[in-house]
């Protein structure tokens, strides 16, 4: 079974780096359906994410940026906040344009696969890896796989009473 990790866990792995190194390896990743990671460099005015790839650049069109963008259940701020952070994606296509590799990528496809093959199979009481993405007075938002958000309410964080989630967690922490 394929493993689904919070964003940022795959970016420096040898397997991820190898699959991003050339046009040929990107095409092989597209064929195999591999989920890869790279850093989002820019969010354009149309909210497309431009991703830095070792062999060129990738483009995640706005409607491929996250589950729920098309139907409005996810707001555009979810894309804008990904700038300068690792994002997961699947390669849709890759080609040479003007001597440089340009790849069309889909973060939504990676998230949909994560939901179908991982999240939908979780049961109450399962312990899963997560990365803390944001702290609020009422709880901690975490990435539970491929950038999919979840909330840990403050009353579920500790046996003893705490005044703020920062008493237990830090942003970026793997839990």
Please report, for each region that a protein language model flagged, where it lies by residue.
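Single-stranded RNA-binding regions, centering on S1/OB-family and related RNA-binding modules
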Residues: 1-175
């Amino acid at each position: 079974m394929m493993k689904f990790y919070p964003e940022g866990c795959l970016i420096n792995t040898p397997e991820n780096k190898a699959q991003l190194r050339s046009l040929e390896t990107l095409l092989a990743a597209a064929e195999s359906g591999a989920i890869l990671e790279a850093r989002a460099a820019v969010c354009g005015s149309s909210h497309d994410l431009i991703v830095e790839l070792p062999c060129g650049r990738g483009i995640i069109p706005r409607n491929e940026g996250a589950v729920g963008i098309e139907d409005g259940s996810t707001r555009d701020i979810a894309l804008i906040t990904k700038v300068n952070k690792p994002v997961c994606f699947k390669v849709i296509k890759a080609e040479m344009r003007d001597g440089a590799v340009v790849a069309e990528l889909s973060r939504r496809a990676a998230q949909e696969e994560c939901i179908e093959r991982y999240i939908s199979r979780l049961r109450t009481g399962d312990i899963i890896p997560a990365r803390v993405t944001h702290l609020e007075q009422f709880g901690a938002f975490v990435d539970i796989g491929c950038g999919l958000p979840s909330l840990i309410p403050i009353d579920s964080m500790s046996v003893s009473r705490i005044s703020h989630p920062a008493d237990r967690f830090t942003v970026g922490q793997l839990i």
